Amino acid sequence: MLTNVVEYRKTIGRPAPGRVLIATETGELKESTKRLEPAIGVVSDTYGLEFGKSVDENLAPVAMAGRVLAFPFENREGFRIGDPVCAAPGGTVSLMTREEVKIWPDRIVGVVTEIPGGLTQGKENEVYINGRIWIKV
């Protein structure tokens, strides 16, 4: 299931697919640690087109456009299609209030597009959901 375009970016550690990343002072990326941090993107395991790949093992495929699976901070049953989300602790996404969207529109990581059921998804069950939700970035 190929749903997004990624750019390989240098990371601190090895963030798992579905984790939200923020930039450090040196330009390396790391998992978000608090709500409303300015995020760069979400690590993807469903990409179909990639840019910037090299043999460097500290590179992660970061979704730049399309749909990507992301770990929710709150209970996933509280998310609805169309909800805007921001970075949250542990590299997760959090629901944004209408007030937060007005004050910090630049902090929107994406918009919820699907809350999948089951453990896998795709024609051949090739995508492991692992409690994640789909967002459009």
Regions found by a protein language model. Give the residues of each.
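Extracellular receptor-binding modules and their adjoining Ser/Thr/Gly/Asp/Asn-rich linkers
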Residues: 1-137
